[in-house]
Regions:
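C-terminal folded domains that constitute the principal catalytic or ligand-binding module
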Residues: 63-65, 71-194
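Generic structural signal for bulky hydrophobic/aromatic residues embedded
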Residues: 2-3, 121
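S-adenosyl-L-methionine/SAH cofactor-binding core of RNA-modifying enzymes
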Residues: 3-84
Length: 194
């Protein structure tokens, strides 16, 4: 499972990160940070397509999406500490998605995990003809769903063994989880293929 042409850059403050700054200063790219904002671009934004086509030398600019992989608390901290990332234009989704990360509660409606974000972003970029249709993001969600199922099974084993929970989510108290999962997969079969 991988995203072609992706790189992982680890840290908290990226202000002096040589590799990231090299990418951000490369005129071949149009850099955006995948993060919610009222003025965020979406895949369908005409301004996004204009920005990608406005390269010098007649070549289209490549979309460079910075995906912050952290809890919401640390994602905010990373942006606060990294003005080179914080000041980038934001990229968000056309619509709100419901997270399938049923093991962990999201802080608000429309908040999804990093893997889900990448999946939905690819799908929206495909619908806008920015990403080729032959790129298949389904393996991302297949692995993600297996990970969630594994986490939930481990939680059930923990409960059966009488070990106290350490998370804000506790499957013991969420008796409707499986019903919600089934209903979500029936209502949205395209995103629930494994």
């Amino acid at each position: 499972m991988s995203l072609v042409d992706s790189e992982i850059i680890v840290g908290i403050d990226f202000t002096q990160n040589k590799r990231l700054n090299q990418l951000l200063s490369d005129s071949a790219y149009f850099p955006l940070v995948l993060y919610p904002a009222d003025d965020a671009f979406t895949a369908q934004s005409p301004l996004l397509k204009e920005a990608l086509e406005s390269a010098s030398g007649g070549e289209k600019r490549k979309l460079l999406v910075i995906v912050v992989d952290a809890t919401w608390f640390f994602a905010k901290k990373m942006l606060r500490l990294s003005p080179n990332v914080r000041n980038l234009p934001k990229l968000s989704f056309q619509q709100l998605y419901t997270s399938e990360f049923t093991f962990k509660r999201q802080p608000a409606e429309g908040c999804v995990s990093t893997i889900e974000s990448c999946y939905h972003l690819i799908r929206e970029m495909q619908s806008a003809d920015i990403v080729p249709a032959q790129i298949d993001p389904e393996p991302l969600m297949a692995v993600f769903r297996r990970m969630v199922d594994f986490q939930l099974e481990a939680e059930q084993k923990r409960i059966a063994m009488g070990i106290p929970g350490r998370h804000s989510y506790d499957a013991e108290r969420d008796v409707n989880r499986k019903k919600r999962q089934r209903r979500q997969r029936v209502e949205n079969p395209a995103s629930s293929k494994s």
